């Protein structure tokens, strides 16, 4: 996700003269907004700077070729791109972190209401404390100074943490080898009840969008279980969290929530997404017939749902 946003911000250019699309505001939590530890006087130097630069390289799209030149990250982190290109950043939160304790409801227009569901301060504190603890394992006397390099290092570290967490969960969620005709035969009882404990996923920005009588849920990668009790019993559109992983949506939610459309965003090539139990439950246990809209025509879901292109074409022909 970080790499995609970096690429978009680089290509879109200046916020006042965008190449691709105009963006009114960006919600993004950088280290400088969520870190609560007091900053030290002085500057970053020596071994500390070297370690921070190494962490920063892990998350930059321009360093994937194997380059160890820190200059490739300068000006190219999400935080620096937002500032450098003049984007309005977390303005609805008065420049502070996007979290439920700061602002819970945002009116995007007279008719569009955004209810923030996640993260809370607890999730953000866990995230930043994990990173600080990791840094202290590398640097005994780790200190925080007022330097943009901390944002870059934090951003790069989270990409690496997220990848490691995905690798650990593959065996639990894999759908490889399962054909579309088999999803209805899956034994739902085998659905794992473990909730995703990934600190990166649990700090995802999640929100419920309401326009007139239309309701849309965008949980990001956060497990829906964290805010399930706050949700209405009917939702028009739900974007499946974490590419349809079983650890990020509960069987209870699918069985008890009337959803018209589930959006599935995955190419199916990494980590075995989507989880067969999730697809099987939507097909057989949802209280009303729900349509699955895919952004890729996955071979394992060949006869299930529609691609976004097909859905858009049908919508246009109806009108």
What are these regions (language model features)?
Residues 6-13, 27, 279, 283:
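Short, well-ordered alpha-helical packing segments
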Residues 212, 222-225, 229-235, 252-256, ...:
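C-terminal regulatory/interaction regions
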Residues 1-19, 123, 127-130, 191-266, ...:
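Active-site-proximal loop/helix segments of hydrolase catalytic cores
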Residues 11-214, 290-291, 295-296, 306-319:
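Flexible, acidic/histidine-containing loops and adjacent segments that form or flank the divalent-metal
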């Amino acid at each position: 996700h970080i790499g995609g946003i970096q690429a978009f911000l680089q290509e879109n250019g200046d916020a006042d003269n965008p190449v691709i699309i105009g963006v009114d505001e960006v919600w993004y939590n950088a280290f400088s907004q969520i870190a609560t530890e007091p900053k030290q006087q002085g500057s970053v130097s020596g071994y500390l700077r070297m370690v921070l630069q190494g962490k920063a390289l892990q998350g930059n799209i321009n360093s994937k070729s194997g380059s160890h030149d820190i200059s490739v990250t300068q000006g190219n982190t999400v935080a620096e791109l937002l500032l450098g290109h003049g984007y309005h950043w977390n303005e609805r939160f008065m420049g502070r972190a996007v979290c439920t304790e700061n602002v819970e409801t945002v009116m995007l227009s007279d008719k569009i209401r955004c209810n923030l569901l996640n993260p809370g301060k607890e999730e953000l504190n866990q995230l930043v404390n994990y990173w600080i603890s990791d840094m202290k394992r590398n640097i005994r006397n780790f200190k925080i100074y007022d330097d943009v390099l901390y944002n870059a290092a934090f951003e790069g570290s989270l990409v690496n943490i997220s990848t490691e967490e995905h690798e650990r969960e593959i065996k639990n969620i894999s759908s490889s080898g399962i054909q579309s005709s088999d999803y209805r035969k899956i034994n739902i009882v085998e659905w794992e009840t473990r909730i995703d404990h990934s600190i990166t996923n649990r700090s995802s920005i999640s929100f419920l969008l309401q326009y007139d009588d239309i309701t849309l849920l965008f949980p990001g990668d956060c497990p829906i279980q964290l805010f399930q009790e706050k949700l209405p019993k009917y939702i028009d559109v739900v974007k499946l969290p974490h590419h349809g992983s079983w650890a990020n949506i509960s069987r209870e939610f699918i069985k008890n929530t009337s959803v018209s459309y589930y959006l599935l965003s995955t190419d199916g090539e990494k980590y075995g997404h989507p989880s067969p139990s999730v697809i099987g439950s939507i097909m057989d246990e949802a209280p009303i017939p729900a349509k699955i809209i895919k952004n890729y025509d996955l071979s394992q879901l060949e006869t299930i749902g529609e691609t976004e292109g097909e859905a858009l074409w049908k919508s246009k022909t109806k009108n």
